[in-house]
Amino acid sequence: MQDQKPGGACASCRYMVEWGQTLQRRADMEISHFFMNGDIKGAIAYMREHEEFKDILPAYVAIFENGEYRRFDVPDKLNEILLLYQIYYRDTFYCGLPEAEAAEKLLAGLKALLNVPDAEEALLTERLHAVFEAEGYHALFGKTQGYYGPYIWRETVPTVYQVELPDGTAEYTVNILKGFVFRSWMDYLTFGRFGTGGWASPDGTINCIEQAYDFESERFLVSLLKHEAQHTVDMKQFPGITPEELEYRAKLVELHYSGNLGLLQKFLSEADESRTGDSHAMASARIKREFADTDQRSLPCVQARALELLHAHTDEMEEKYGKQKTVSNG
């Protein structure tokens, strides 16, 4: 057998694999628009026209066209509850029932199942919690981006991190949520390809869904841990700090530690001074102004500028709120 020369059959195979991956990414991006818009009929039509979805298409046909719903590895009583949510998703995203009508049908079904026909939604939520917790599950109910959907998982693991920040080290606790059974509507519609990565508890603790994160990634270590730890430090150091000021400082910390130039571009794309009630948009607008004269193609320049702005803003905060003792474990 002759050796393959560079650029021969092996290179062709590699090219075909890379091209195939490019097509798959493009297809994923295109079909994601259907899911984001809650258009399951459109998604199914798209899948029928694209060979790369042939393996998953039958699952969509079974649920949405035939009404053959999924059963989960939980007790029957809990499956009965989750079935009502699945019917709500089919009604809303496939059958075209207005969300308000589908929600009314869902809530009526849940009340009947739990034998609380006249319960207000708050009481219904309490009963749902109790039913799942009695079987050893954690649960969160309510709406995500306008649609009902429960989060059901088996284990919550508080994990303490020592987070390096520009002015010292902060201790920050993250709840890692493991063993998910159900992760609301987007996860259900996409069989786990898309979905919520976590949320903040009322006390500010971040809850991270284990399957949604690479815990060695910059997304977790910088955009989540350092961002949220900086919030914690700033709220202790400057009790009167505004949401816009909090976000501005946390974004600067991200930019200082990030190895990705695309992060700055992401913030610039979010800048919008007309959205005065949106702390993220306003913070990004300030960043856009203050990085206008920075070489945005140079990572060291971006990192240095971010640190310079953070220190200047700390001086501004101390003048505004009074100098407090620095919160640091390092």
Placement of each model-derived feature along the sequence:
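N-terminal maturation segment of proteins
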Residues: 12, 23, 28-58, 165-180, ...
